[in-house]
Amino acid sequence: VGLDHDHVWGLLGAIAKEPEAELVAIADPHPELVDKAKQQVPAEVKFYSDYVKMLDEAKPEAVIVTTANNRHLEILRECAKRHIHYSTEKPLASTAADAREMERLANAAHIKLMVNYWNAWAASTHELFHRVYAGELGPVQKIIVQYGHEGPKEIGVSKYFADWLYDPVKNGGGAIVDFGCYGAEWALWLKGRPSSVFAYSLKLKTAQANAVDDDAVILLEYPDATAIIQASWDWPYSKGQVQVFGPKGSLLATGDGVLYRAAKSQADVDHPDGQPVTLGPVPHETSNPIAYFLYCIRNDKPIENPVAASLNVGVVEILDAAKESIRTGRAVKLPAN
């Protein structure tokens, strides 16, 4: 459902490579995007301008949603009525109220609800998570997450994607949502729910006529830890990494690998953040979003973190609290679940 999110083209490629996946229909109202999709999918795939008509006529078992964040609830409501499993690109929704309602509807309809993050399938992500949970660092005391790039327009996103990415209602914000969600995802997964949220944001590209931030910092407070989230559309290059510290050492995960540095170890000139860790193979069912979504549906397995609905309701609650903190200039207490 939707072709106006540029991640859709990678997902169509993943569907084509997945033996268990059959693409039956696509819904999007933009003729230019439909023409592009027709060049990339089998001829028997049906196209609709109205996604509700598609749900009724094509009767899919599951949908992949790739459109504006503020439409996620509306589309899930229609899927829940028809008991159709639902996966969407991050974040789960543009507001916490929408996210909570999506989880409620999915649970009531007994359908799978998944939120796709690209980092969830990386070998470096799996390795860092398992080492942290195995206690290799001791109790997590600090998490530093940095996700960003030069900016949507600067990296050449489509005009259809840009139309809603730069809209504070359709997206829910700017960089604070687009990349801040990764930091909230990591923090909730590795440390749990914070007690308070403080944030500030900037509009560095003042010449661009849009109403969203392009640089943000979010500070999450825990009784025994802090998490610092840096999200930006202003960096000179693309970057996505998380660094975790505990009394026994630190781990740094990038898209390319994991570095480990033990407590009291001497810094290595070639590897100041630690020594490279050998990454094990990722099982096929957790190697990409299509394979995992189908695996959970076919085997009636629950969607697990970090792509599960419950954690991602928390992600959007953190983002809402961050935006409220920016508005008031004060830290926002986050109620316990």
Task: Locate predicted features.
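Active-site loop of classical SDR/Rossmann-like NAD(P)-dependent oxidoreductases
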Residues: 6, 32, 278-291
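Rossmann-fold dehydrogenase core element
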Residues: 101-119, 139-141
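Beta-loop-alpha module in the N-terminal Rossmann-like domain of NAD(P)-dependent dehydrogenases
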Residues: 33, 45-105
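Contiguous beta-strand/loop segments that form the cofactor/metal-binding neighborhood of enzyme cores
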Residues: 184-258, 289-302, 320-321
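C-terminal helix-rich "cap/oligomerization" subdomain common to oxidoreductases
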Residues: 62-64, 292-337
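Predominantly a Rossmann-like dinucleotide-binding segment in NAD(P)-dependent oxidoreductases
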Residues: 119-209, 329
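N-terminal Rossmann-like dinucleotide-binding module
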Residues: 1-42
